[in-house]
């Protein structure tokens, strides 16, 4: 079986193209927009370290773009209770309309991406993806026990 490793890059590029008009309007770099949407869509992740580890964005880019989002009033930094070393990133009220518009773009992108794919095929894709994730977890688990 031959995998097309360009697939993930193509999704990323196409998604960025869909976000470009909003980013341009807001004068936000794509990375800043991605950080804002990541924090809004994944409330379990709250720190710059989370963004680096989960989104795989380089630390210096996270730092610069978080500063921009804070300075523009889209994010606030709040100290983490019981751990002075950590700072939690919180979306502000001002970010609400941006997040709402971003989610509409994401929903439309998903709709367009899955055009021509019926519910049964989506269900099968979900099952396949879950199995691939389980397989990767098992590979990681085995490697960590060596």
Describe the residue ranges of each PLM region.
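Amphipathic, non-transmembrane alpha-helical scaffold segments
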Residues: 8-12, 16, 55, 99, ...
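Short, locally clustered residues in the helix-turn-helix/winged-helix DNA-binding domain
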Residues: 12, 37-43, 103, 130
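N-terminal helix-turn-helix DNA-binding core of bacterial DNA-binding proteins
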Residues: 17-61
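Charged, amphipathic alpha-helical coiled-coil/dimerization segments
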Residues: 68-126
């Amino acid at each position: 079986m031959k995998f097309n490793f360009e697939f993930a890059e193509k999704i990323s590029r196409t998604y960025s193209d869909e976000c470009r008009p909003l980013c341009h309007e807001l004068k936000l770099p794509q990375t800043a927009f991605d950080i804002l949407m990541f924090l809004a869509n994944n409330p379990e992740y709250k720190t710059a370290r989370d963004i680096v580890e989960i989104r795989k964005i380089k630390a210096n880019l996270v730092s610069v773009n978080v500063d921009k989002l804070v300075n523009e009033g889209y994010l606030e930094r709040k100290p983490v209770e019981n751990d002075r070393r950590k700072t939690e990133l919180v979306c502000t009220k001002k970010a609400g309309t941006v997040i709402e518009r971003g989610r509409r773009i994401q929903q439309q992108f998903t709709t367009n991406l899955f055009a021509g794919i019926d519910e049964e095929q989506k269900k099968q894709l979900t099952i396949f993806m879950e199995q691939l994730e389980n397989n990767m977890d098992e590979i990681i688990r085995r490697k960590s026990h060596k």
